[in-house]
Structure formats: C-alpha cells, structure tokens
Amino acid sequence: VTCRPPGQALIKLIEAAAYALDVSEHSVSVVRLDVLPLDEVHELARVVAGWLRNAGFIEPNTRLDAMWQPSLWMPGREWRTAVEAVRWLDAFEKTANNGVDVERERSAHHPVENLEVAACGLCGSVLPDEVYFETLEIWLDKGEPEIECSRCQSRALIGDWPAEFGFAVGSPAVRFNNWPSLRGSFVNELRRQLGGRTFVVKAHT
C-alpha cells in the first residue's frame, strides 16, 4: 500500500477539527470605565459600531441563531487584519458563536477561569484576594472604588490597577467571541475610539 500525503482540503479539515477540540469558549471585551450619561453611552456605542463596520471588521449578522450565532454582528470582510496570523484562520469562519457584541448596558465583565488578582502599578504589590474580589460588588453597587496599596500607600481606582486577567465594570463595551488573538494595534485603536479610561477583559470558560 502506498501512502500519499493528504491533500489541502483534508489538511484544512484536520486543522478545523483540531481547532474545535483544542479551543474552549473565550472572549475579549474592551470596556469603557468612565461613567457616562445613558444617552452618551448609546451614542458612543453607535459611533464605535459604525467605525468597526465601516472599517470592515464587522457586519450585520445574517445567520442569527440563539444557540449558535447569537450576536448582532458577525466578522466582516477585513476581520483578518484585526487578528494575529495563525494556521486555523479558515476554521474560525466556521466556528459557532464567533460574533461581536457592542453592549450599551453597564455591567460586570469577568475573566471567569482566567481570573488573576491585580497588582499595584507603582510597586507591583499584589492585592489580597479578598480585597480584590470585594471590589467587584462595590464597583457594581456604588461605583468604582479607590484602593490604597498596603506596601507603598499609593492610591488608584481599581480599574487602573494592572491586571492581565482582571475584571471591569462599565459601558459601552465591545466583546469579541472566540476570535483569534487580537492585534495590539487594533485593540489600541478600539480603545481610542471608546475614549476615556478603558480596560481589556480576557475571559475563558
């Protein structure tokens, strides 16, 4: 029996299967932290969605499905320019729940299984777990708390404490569901479009 190398179609099928098995649900949300009047939140969400659409990163979802494709936006013609190059890009287009949500309602954005405690931006001292976790409830109920570092006594709003996998509360927010890693330049421009103070939440379930 002569073994021949697999054709390109089979290679793509294998890569797609490997991608589906290897990748769990994940998302990246870019959140505006500053509290804005509701009408300004809605207008900013409209403007940011318009920028994403006009640039070709997203387009209206023509395959809406409550279970498989629930987002109002789907990847647009230029989505590849927003992400890092990986071998399974073709598989991404066939992935369930790979849309984009532009959220107007103020809510908590949590990294779930990725959660790591924030550290002081000046001295690097890590917040005690219980202090960091308590700030989320305070943030939701009363507004963003200011925290003092126990080591260097510097104070900063919790959203300004560096955390690679931290949480955030705010609006509007843009969430990319199950996308490949976003390019830093794209994220920076999106943060500029949102304006003010922003936070990037990387969730994994």
Across the structure, where does each feature detected by a protein language model lie?
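Short, non-ligating residues that shape and space the ligands of small metal-coordination modules
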Residues: 129-130, 158-159
